[in-house]
């Protein structure tokens, strides 16, 4: 198998590159800078310098490859709707066009459970749960659009599969955990409703397992949730994550309704005071971390043979041994 990976210098991408190389699989990875090129080269992948906007560069990089893993996305809380659209929708369109040009046979697209976010709890939902008619934030809206583009592209000679992991975590995290630690240290973090509700999670190694299985045996035009298995209480899990870094989660509490109102007010004030910049997506953060979000991944286990082999305890032990999180952090757009 010869593979091409977008987002290879991001947190998930780096782990995917390592997993592919460990299996003796040839890997090329799209990177946007020389620094990122050095990182992916150190992992054993061949860097391809370019962006999601350059169809010819993508086509040349994919030439001779069998499988495409599309993990690149813009996730920044302060990106504009136009920036989200350019990266997540137009970027995916360009990747699909280049894949067809290069005659890629199979594509695995990394999406997110956030495409379902509508402000209400998500309780053990499966892949049949409908997308909301009116997404309320640029990130989930454009990720949902990208999903649909990928699924519509499925056909003879080009098999496309979508995976939706929830709450990716693990050692070498340069995304969520460093941000959580910063919020704790700067006293910007509060438990919403005490954090006493359930969440699904997915260790980064388990995400990679699911992606590889989707590439090997996933039927075209399908979507798969990926999780660690049984959901956990959010407060307990975040407390354990922080303890691996020697940090105690001694923070206050805020009711959900107050958190939602504060987020709405914060976004409104930002738009009024800093109209030239996009307000941070505070409401989305409250909805994704302040409500129960639990997913049913039976479909992936049944159809792909997915097992989610890394347990919470194994992942926490590895985090503890790895030392401080966030070293060598990369930008939000991988």
UniProtKB/Swiss-Prot annotation:
Membrane-spanning intervals of the chain: none
Keyword tags: NAD, Oxidoreductase
GO biological process, alphabetically ordered: steroid biosynthetic process
Reactions this protein catalyses: aurachin B + NAD(+) + H2O = 4-hydroxy-2-methyl-3-oxo-4-[(2E,6E)-farnesyl]-3,4-dihydroquinoline 1-oxide + NADH; 3,4-dihydroxy-2-methyl-4-[(2E,6E)-farnesyl]-3,4-dihydroquinoline 1-oxide + NAD(+) = 4-hydroxy-2-methyl-3-oxo-4-[(2E,6E)-farnesyl]-3,4-dihydroquinoline 1-oxide + NADH + H(+)
UniProt xrefs under InterPro entries: 3Beta_OHSteriod_DH/Estase, NAD(P)-bd_dom_sf, NAD(P)-dependent_oxidoreduct
Pfam entry (one): 3Beta_HSD
Enzyme class, UniProt record, top EC level: oxidoreductase
Stored SUPFAM superfamilies: NAD(P)-binding Rossmann-fold domains
Cellular component per GO, a single term: cytoplasm
Active-site residues from the entry: 139
Result of knocking out the encoding gene: Mutant accumulates aurachin D and aurachin C and does not produce aurachin B and aurachin A.
Gene3D superfamilies for the chain: NAD(P)-binding Rossmann-like Domain
GO molecular function: aldehyde dehydrogenase (NAD+) activity; oxidoreductase activity, acting on the CH-OH group of donors, NAD or NADP as acceptor
EC number: 1.1.1.394
Family of the protein in this entry: Belongs to the 3-beta-HSD family.
Function: Ketoreductase that catalyzes the final step in the conversion of aurachin C to aurachin B. Catalyzes the reduction of 4-hydroxy-2-methyl-3-oxo-4-[(2E,6E)-farnesyl]-3,4-dihydroquinoline-1-oxide to form 3,4-dihydroxy-2-methyl-4-[(2E,6E)-farnesyl]-3,4-dihydroquinoline 1-oxide, which then undergoes a spontaneous dehydration to form aurachin B. Accepts both NADH and NADPH, but has a preference for NADH.
Name of this protein: 4-hydroxy-2-methyl-3-oxo-4-farnesyl-3,4-dihydroquinoline-1-oxide ketoreductase
Species annotation: Stigmatella aurantiaca
